[in-house]
Amino acid sequence: MAKIKTVYEKCDVLVVGGGMAGTGAAFEARHWGRDLKIICVEKANIDRSGAVAQGLYAINCYMGMQWDENQPEDHVRYARNDLMGIVREDLGYDMARHVDSTVHMFDEWGLPMMRNEKTGRYLREGKWQIMIHGESYKPIVAEAAKKSADKIYNRIMITHLLMDESKENRVGGAVGFNMRTGNFHVFRAKAVIVAAGGASHIFKPRAVGEGMGRTWYAP
């Protein structure tokens, strides 16, 4: 049996998670911190991990401001109506005003986009979505993260965040293990970005489990 090792790493920015959010965070961290040491840690492999691992057939939101198709105010109005007023309009507006530039960046990186041959505009499916050939979506974004981060650790499952002993209520790193070798990894960082998946089940459940019961005890 191979001896399990403990591996130590120090960095300025530690990104936990290598899905679309994590790879994007690594890219943005490099953009704003040219001289920082950036490490991204992913439990699978960033080339095909996260919710977009298999690709997408559309980008769900694109304003089309350069063609005056929609404006951020339009999207805020849509979200407000859809959610019956329970919405942070400032956050919705902030996301909407940045989405076009992000899509253009994907286009520059080589994501195949469907266009109208006459006008050059992206083809839409409904008011907000634009159509793409998205099988290569995640590998394209992962490549940008590889160029941005100093190190990418695949197959490392982060289990706990570390608290900074010198500063109260401040995270100072994370620990996890390699799912192939069993080695234990300790990451110390000045900043930790947790991009480990969507935030669901953070509320008090009210379901009584009827659906699950019907599944397991079908007639």
Predicted regions and their residues:
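Residue-level preference for nonpolar/small residues embedded in alpha-helices
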Residues: A21, H98, Y137, M212-T215
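Glycine-rich loop(s) and the adjacent beta-strand/alpha-helix scaffold that form part
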Residues: A191-P219
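Core beta-strand elements of the Rossmann-like FAD/NAD(P) dinucleotide-binding domain
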Residues: Y8-C11, T181-A191
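Conserved N-terminal/central alpha/beta ligand/cofactor-binding core
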Residues: I4-K5, L36-K37, E42-G172, F177-N183, ...
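Generic start-of-chain signal for non-secretory N-termini
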Residues: M1-V13, M20
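Generic hydrophobic/aromatic pocket-lining and core-packing "Φ" positions
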Residues: A26, V103, W216-Y217
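N-terminal Rossmann-like FAD-binding beta1-loop-alpha1 element of flavoenzymes
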Residues: V13-C40
